[in-house]
């Protein structure tokens, strides 16, 4: 049996219900009383924030068990940012007010006291050497089944006891899951027998590598060619030339994530008269060997599905049988090469000085660095931060969301699979009506002064030209262990609905997410006027929709009911 000295137990007594991260943030802990200087912990303001300043305390075992702990017995170790994950604050694309402020919420597993984790691989857990190390740890246990821990210092006497990993639930705030989910799979849909299905051409993007199932050793070159094709380019453009300062007006950085940087600007209409004036530039580094923002850079094979899905969902604006403006408009995609332009660096530094950036300084990029730049139409504030006039506005916003999903289902077997409030953008509009086409029928909705846009297809599933694109979440256990908000119940409900087969088309997942959005419209979104008769009347309508939403099998089914369609 592992024994810990009474001195150490006394040290843990006051904070025995707190994890080490809480102790770092609590000024009343014993560490503070010992005058140990803690690192500054920065409150996060960014669109996709993570706990980049997480650390843990290592307590060396005293030479004499009865001697009290001293300052020399403790040291601060900075935890690796690449393994530090958190739920982010809600997205905020623009606006004049300050960005939404959120508490730090680390997403890691808490290691048992007295055990040290390393990244060494071993073939069998029973054959691993087990040791004791007296430490208080805050570490991330890698979810890969091929990796296990190798512990040091004091060997346990009994190796016959079963050692099991404990996966505690993780309490989080609602928002975007920061951890990169690069498990996009493209598979050919075919009705042939099982043998032929195994041999079909497909590729799996996982762990930042392209895993090939059949004869695609040259696929990386083909992915680059495909990206260039969607960019309408033959070769990468010089970064400085493609985005010269005089071509962009009122540029400012509005957010960031592990994927890269987000800038908002206006196009110089004299230079490009046919372009949208108010745009968002999403700049994503590609194919470099340098680890950026704690993660490996995306490959061509990983950025290609995002480009394809974004373009296809945008194309629904002009489709004849099923059309909607409810998905974000992508104006242009560019592949550029070279160092970050100086004017972008100045904007990055201004953002860092005012709000604090968690990303690496873009001066790290060299002359040969590649970037994908997605130019998207600015579409307003996310639903979590938007303030509705009353529930009448939010009710008609719900109708826009339902119809957009229904159109996506009909045209591309679309499932969003991550429709939290940060992925729904809303802006005011002077248009009285929203027009769309559903199953060749023209529909006109009242806008009530708001226009809704759905964004972010990281977890989405679509069928395009007999190919299915989806993100395989079957091995991402951390996502399904999270608690603290209905959002994380929805991920588990999706997994049950799909039976963990993420390639299958099950539009019920859209209904599950609609139930989540309806709950948030009732409980979380902001309203200006809540004491009016109109507000109370439409709150009742939204409650009625909440009571029946789970009876529908798809957004199409729901739209048929709401708009009395056949």
Swiss-Prot record:
Q: Which reaction does it catalyse?
A: L-seryl-[protein] + ATP = O-phospho-L-seryl-[protein] + ADP + H(+); L-threonyl-[protein] + ATP = O-phospho-L-threonyl-[protein] + ADP + H(+)
Q: Provide the coiled-coil residue spans.
A: none
Phenotype upon loss of function? Viable, however adults display a decrease in survival which is stronger in females than males, and both sexes display a decrease in fertility. Loss of phosphorylation of histone H3 leading to reduced centromeric cohesion. RNAi-mediated knockdown reduces the size of salivary gland nuclei. Also results in a strong decrease in chromosome-bound pds5 in larval salivary glands and a significant decrease in chromatin-bound vtd in mitotic and interphase embryo cells.
- What keywords is this UniProt entry annotated with? ATP-binding, Chromosome, Cytoplasm, Cytoskeleton, Kinase, Nucleotide-binding, Nucleus, Phosphoprotein, Serine/threonine-protein kinase, Transferase
The top EC class is: transferase
Q: Which Pfam families match?
A: Haspin_kinase
Subcellular location(s): the record lists:
Nucleus lamina; Chromosome; Cytoplasm, Cytoskeleton, Spindle
Entry GO CC: chromatin; cytoplasm; nuclear lamina; nucleus; spindle
Question: Which segments constitute the Protein kinase domain?
Answer: 248-566
What cofactor(s) does the depicted protein rely on? Mg(2+)
Q: Which InterPro entries match?
A: GSG2_C, Kinase-like_dom_sf, Prot_kinase_dom, Protein_kinase_ATP_BS
UniProt GO MF annotations: ATP binding; histone H3T3 kinase activity; protein serine kinase activity
Q: Which GO terms describe its biological process?
A: intracellular signal transduction; mitotic cell cycle; positive regulation of maintenance of mitotic sister chromatid cohesion, centromeric; positive regulation of maintenance of sister chromatid cohesion; positive regulation of protein localization to chromatin; post-translational protein modification; protein phosphorylation
Active-site annotation: 418
Where is this protein chiefly located? nucleus
Record-stated family: Belongs to the protein kinase superfamily. Ser/Thr protein kinase family. Haspin subfamily.
PANTHER family in the cross-refs: INTERLEUKIN-1 RECEPTOR-ASSOCIATED KINASE (PTHR24419), SERINE_THREONINE-PROTEIN KINASE HASPIN (PTHR24419:SF18)
Q: Note the subunit structure.
A: Interacts with pds5 and vtd.
Protein name (database record): Serine/threonine-protein kinase haspin homolog
Organism of derivation: Drosophila melanogaster (Fruit fly)
What does the organism's lineage look like at the top?
A: Eukaryota, Metazoa, Ecdysozoa, Arthropoda, Hexapoda
């Amino acid at each position: 049996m592992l024994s810990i000295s009474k001195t150490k137990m006394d040290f843990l007594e006051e904070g025995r219900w707190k994890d080490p991260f809480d102790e770092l943030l609590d000024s009343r802990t014993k560490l503070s009383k010992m005058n140990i200087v803690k690192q500054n912990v920065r409150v996060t303001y960014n669109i996709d924030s993570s706990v980049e300043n997480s650390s843990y305390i290592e307590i060396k075992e005293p030479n004499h068990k009865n001697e009290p702990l001293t300052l020399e017995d403790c040291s601060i170790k900075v935890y690796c940012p690449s393994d530090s994950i958190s739920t982010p604050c809600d997205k905020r694309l623009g606006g004049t007010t300050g960005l939404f402020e959120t508490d730090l919420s680390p997403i890691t597993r808490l290691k048992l006291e007295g055990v040290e984790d390393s990244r060494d691989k071993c073939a069998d857990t029973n054959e691993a050497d087990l040791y004791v190390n007296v430490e208080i740890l805050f570490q991330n246990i890698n979810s890969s089944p091929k990796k296990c821990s190798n512990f040091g210092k004091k060997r346990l006497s009994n190796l016959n006891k079963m050692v099991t990993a404990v996966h505690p639930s993780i309490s989080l705030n609602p928002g975007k899951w920061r951890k990169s989910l690069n498990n996009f799979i493209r598979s050919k849909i075919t009705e042939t027998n099982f043998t032929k299905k195994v041999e079909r051409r497909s590729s799996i993007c996982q762990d930042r590598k392209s895993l090939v199932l059949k004869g695609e050793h040259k696929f990386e070159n083909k992915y680059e060619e495909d990206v260039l094709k969607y960019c309408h380019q033959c070769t990468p453009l010089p970064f400085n030339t493609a985005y010269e300062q005089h071509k962009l007006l009122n540029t400012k950085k509005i957010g960031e994530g592990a994927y890269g940087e987000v800038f908002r600007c206006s196009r110089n209409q004299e230079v490009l008269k046919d372009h949208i004036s108010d745009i968002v530039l999403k700049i994503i580094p590609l194919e470099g060997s340098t680890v950026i923002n704690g993660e490996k850079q995306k490959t061509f094979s990983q950025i290609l599905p995002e480009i394809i899905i974004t373009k296809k969902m945008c194309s629904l604006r002009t489709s004849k049988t099923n059309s909607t403006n409810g998905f974000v408009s992508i104006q242009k995609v560019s592949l550029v090469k070279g160092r970050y332009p100086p004017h972008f660096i100045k904007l990055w530094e201004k953002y860092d000085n005012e709000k604090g950036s968690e990303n690496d300084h873009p001066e790290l990029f060299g002359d040969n660095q590649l970037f994908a730049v997605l130019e998207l139409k600015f579409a307003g504030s996310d639903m979590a931060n938007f303030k509705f006039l009353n529930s009448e506005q939010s009710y008609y916003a719900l109708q826009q969301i339902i119809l957009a999903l229904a159109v996506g289902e009909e045209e591309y077997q679309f499932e969003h699979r991550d429709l939290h409030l940060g992925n729904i953008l809303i802006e005011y509009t002077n248009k009285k009506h929203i027009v769309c086409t559903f199953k060749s029928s023209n529909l006109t909705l009242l806008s009530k002064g708001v226009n809704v846009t759905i964004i972010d297809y990281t977890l989405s599933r679509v069928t395009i030209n007999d190919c299915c694109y989806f993100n395989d979440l079957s091995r991402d256990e951390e996502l399904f262990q999270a608690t603290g908000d209905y959002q994380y119940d929805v991920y588990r409900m999706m997994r049950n609905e799909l039976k963990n087969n993420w390639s299958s088309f099950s539009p019920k997942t859209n209904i599950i997410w609609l139930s989540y959005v309806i709950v948030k419209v009732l409980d979380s979104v902001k309203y200006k006027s809540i004491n009016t008769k109109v507000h109370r009347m439409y709150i009742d309508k939204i409650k009625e929709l909440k009571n029946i939403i789970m009876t529908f099998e798809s957004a199409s089914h729901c739209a048929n009911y709401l708009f009395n369609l056949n």
